């Protein structure tokens, strides 16, 4: 299976992963890109930032702008709505994964 096809299948899980980490602590794009690489996902900033913006637009993340060593950095934290969606997504993902590996 091609890398593009596989990446397309995992985009939903990447969004859940973003919400999961944003629930633990504020995240920002560059650092989160490293987190995804740890799990074997090579995702460009041209893909990652639109995902972050869409999650913010949908009310699942909130952006906080901070000045870090003279640089403006945009951090994202989960919202109440985002946390509710995360809990539901985790439950559904677990159900699917359990089914995939039940044999």
Q: PLM features: residue spans?
A:
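N-terminal helix-turn-helix DNA-binding core of bacterial DNA-binding proteins
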Residues: 6-47
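Basic amphipathic alpha-helical segments that dock to polyanions
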Residues: 48-50, 54-55
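Beta-hairpin "wing" of winged helix-turn-helix
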Residues: 58-72, 77
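A cross-family signal for key residues in well-ordered alpha-helices
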Residues: 17-20, 53, 87
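Basic, amphipathic "hinge/linker" alpha-helix immediately C-terminal to the N-terminal HTH DNA-binding motif
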Residues: 72-90
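Amphipathic alpha-helical dimerization/coiled-coil segments
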Residues: 87-103
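Short, intrinsically disordered or compositionally biased N-terminal tails of bacterial proteins
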Residues: 1-5
């Amino acid at each position: 299976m091609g890398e593009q096809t596989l990446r397309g299948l995992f985009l939903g899980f990447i969004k859940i992963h973003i919400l999961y980490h944003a629930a633990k602590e504020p995240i920002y794009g560059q650092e989160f890109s490293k987190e995804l690489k740890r799990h074997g996902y090579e995702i460009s900033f041209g893909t990652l930032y639109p995902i972050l913006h869409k999650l913010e637009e949908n009310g699942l993340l909130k952006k906080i702008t901070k000045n870090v060593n003279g640089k403006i950095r945009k951090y994202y934290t989960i919202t109440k709505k985002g946390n509710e969606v995360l809990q539901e997504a985790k439950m559904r993902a677990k159900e699917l994964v359990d089914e995939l590996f039940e044999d």
